[in-house]
Amino acid sequence: MLYIEPYPDPQRECERVSNVLAQELIEAGVHFGHRASRWNPKMRPYIHGRKNLIHIIDVRETIRGLLRARKYLKQVASTGSLVLFVGTKRQGAEAIAREAGRCGMPYVSDRWLGGTLTNFRTIRNRLARLEELEVLIPSEAFGAYSKKMQSSLRREHRKMLRNLGGIRTLSRLPECLVVFDPKKEKNAINEARKMGITTVALIDTDCDPDLVDLPIPGNDDSIRSIELVAARLADAILEGKAETAVESQAAAEGAEGGEGAEGKPKPKARPMVAKRSVPKPKA
């Protein structure tokens, strides 16, 4: 007799996923905020309580923010748009660069250069200069330069690679910025707001959530916390890309089968951010 496994109840499945995610977040220390004396009152709705002078973030709010951010980033990636990861804290820079690279997106992990978004043409010119140096230095023509000039060009290349290496694939303005600690990356946030670019951010209890479109309340100082959130967001981007690849393949097969124009995938609309509902402050 053929046994067909029953389809899981959506409500129970959602609760199961949330419980597993909550356990992972707690183990990573995502719920630990800053000292209560350093808090931003606007973060009150996202705070569960206080323990030993440290604010404890409500993990349910972290899950809610993370799921909303994942859904949005999946939509962005499915349209072929770019997502720029930004995190220059020493403890999280390596993880952010790794996860951004894993999902094929540009990143800034060393220092935010003023005008990266608002003066994008200049940034593109600097990237062109970086490519020029990378062609010149290994070439035979480089040997014709004096020792002093060679040293100067190598130094220029190292500096540009450190500052611009992560955004060399930024061929156009990104659709979204993923920021880790908007308080530290305030210049990036300000530029994104000026350019109308959506912001997703891991925000601690000392941050202003009103400056971010999709806040994820959580510890932005812990390495494990940053790694976990960055990995989850990168996974969502990869899912969106995979979705597009499947649709493109199906469209190509349809075109080969004689469907003509009907086999072409329909262009996807630009992802929209739903109006954020702020939880009521806890008594």
Q: Where are the regions that the model predicts?
A:
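Post-transcriptional modification and biogenesis factors for structured RNAs
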Residues: 2-8, 190-194
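N-terminal cationic and glycine-rich segments that engage phosphates or anionic surfaces
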Residues: 3, 11-81, 88-89, 93-136, ...
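Residue-level signature of catalytic and energy-coupling elements of molecular machines
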Residues: 29, 85, 177, 229
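Conserved nucleotide-binding/hydrolysis micro-motifs of P-loop NTPases
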Residues: 31, 89-92, 112-118, 182-186, ...
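Short hydrophobic alpha-helical runs that function as membrane-insertion/retention elements
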Residues: 83-84, 106-109, 178, 198-202, ...
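Extended, charged alpha-helical interaction scaffolds
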Residues: 147-179, 183-200, 204
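Short glycine/threonine-rich loop/turn motifs
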Residues: 187-191, 195-247
